[in-house]
Amino acid sequence: IGEQDQVTELVDVRWHAATVDRDQRETSAGHRGCVIWFTGLSGSGKSTLANEVDKQLHARGYRSFVLDGDNVRHGLNASPSLLESMHGEAFAKRFGLGFGPEARKENIRRIGAVAELFTQAGIITLTAFISPYRRDREAVRKMLSETDFVEVYVKAPLAVCESRDPKGLYKKARAGEIKGFTGINDPYEEPEKAEITIESEKNSPPVLAEQVLVWLERAGVIPSRKK
């Protein structure tokens, strides 16, 4: 531990209560804050579905935001190679996140912490991450109140995901160019108790998004639409 780190460890870091609390923010928004955690293989349709749900929530006047797995890798959870060009090798090695099991664990932990803050702000936070390991998803669930975590398993056969392959990643993994790729040479652990399971190859994104919205209505996250 460096000298600066030792000083930092001695600082009394306390949680500061907000002047405007969560209940007030949720009352203003007209809905509850929560985390909708979309998980599934690469190419299963997580980002597409999360953005479609976000679009429909926004159309109804609700406060929502998508945290996308690719987007956060450009900043908060940037890789060592990306950070090195901006901050140097030492910084990149210390703070950059790769794609091994431990780095993936930290990637999900950080996103869980950000999503929890969004929830306290009364925002419906939609996260789209492969998040292949069950223990990591459950760790995020435990960060939140019991009803604040909604796990959505975006289920699609591996063959379907490979046929989509929008980034060409499966092709590279099959060729041995990518190691530890989920679904090929690293496991994806299916959820055991997902609140919602979506079979993404069976319907269009708007229809699939409607399934999520109906669940949110029944759970009291958002108001039910008047008939």
Language-model segments: residues:
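Conserved phosphate-donor/acceptor-positioning beta-strand/loop module used by diverse small-molecule
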Residues: 126-132, 144-164, 198
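Loop/turn-to-beta-strand initiation segments
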Residues: 63, 121-125, 150
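Conserved lysine of the Walker
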Residues: 46
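Conserved substrate/cofactor phosphate-moiety recognition/catalytic segment
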Residues: 51-116, 120
